[in-house]
Amino acid sequence: MRFTEQLAAAWQRNNSLLCVGLDPDPARLPASLTGTGGAIFSFCRAIVDATADLVCAFKPQIAYFASQRAEDQLEQLISYIHEAYPGVPVILDAKRGDIGSTAEHYAKEAFERYQADAVTVSPYMGFDSMQPYLAHADKGVIVLCRTSNAGGSDVQFLETDGRPVYQVVAERARDVWNTSGQMGLVVGATFPEEIAKVREIVGDMPLLIPGVGAQGGDIEATVRAGRTADGTGMMINSSRAILYASTDSDFADAARRVALATRDQINQFRN
């Protein structure tokens, strides 16, 4: 099944636009897992089991695994999600961007080694740096557009031909880059006016929206700005607020409570 089909099915089946980010910080893992073999996998698996029926996607951040030499645990985690919850797509948050020959190997890493359903990429080096990902025709390619960090404005708001760079990225994604029909854009919840502008430009293209929860993005403003006519179109990501709702042995139950509340709050404003 193609990424966009998986995503649409998950929106409907779980009645959810919530994406849970899997960013396992060893310094914040529960004491019961500290020092145990495979602690990162065990933590993430418990979060996945507690929230899988509440989400439209999971988004592991590769750096949190690679910095701990835990790439094998990332492989194990994605394999587990696919086996236990085959209807939930996995987005590898890698934000790769390099020349075509190198990008071919990053694409193999994402889609062949890790078996992710989608990957985040940077458009800074242009279309040829994204083509190797798009060659995997069933896989999602989610392009950084208007990011949630404050420093994103340094480049994304520079003007070219009378409009900011982030709008040009959205236009190129709509008109030129989306050769597989599986492209999406990253637009931060911290900037709802820009979400609305991107939605206007790209139509029904899926948007990955980080920045709610710990980053303080407003859920109502985000949903109203980014929803499509049928009340979908978004993967609204929350990571830390869910993962670290508790650092005690009840961490998975606490994560479920926060995920459920977040999903239900999102759903208040979908229609």
Curated annotation (Swiss-Prot):
Transmembrane regions listed in the UniProt entry: none
Catalytic activity: orotidine 5'-phosphate + H(+) = UMP + CO2
Family: Belongs to the OMP decarboxylase family. Type 2 subfamily.
UniProt GO MF annotations: orotidine-5'-phosphate decarboxylase activity
This protein's UniProt keywords: Decarboxylase, Lyase, Pyrimidine biosynthesis
Residues at the active site: K95
EC code(s) of this entry: 4.1.1.23
HAMAP family found in the cross-reference section: OMPdecase_type2
Gene Ontology biological process terms, A to Z: 'de novo' pyrimidine nucleobase biosynthetic process; 'de novo' UMP biosynthetic process
Gene name in the database record: pyrF
Pfam families per UniProt: OMPdecase
Pathway assigned to this chain's UniProt record: Pyrimidine metabolism; UMP biosynthesis via de novo pathway; UMP from orotate: step 2/2
Ranges in a coiled coil: none
Name recorded for this polypeptide: Orotidine 5'-phosphate decarboxylase
InterPro entries assigned to the protein according to its UniProt record, in alphabetical order: Aldolase_TIM, OMPdecase_AS, OMPdecase_type-2, OMPdeCOase_dom, RibuloseP-bd_barrel
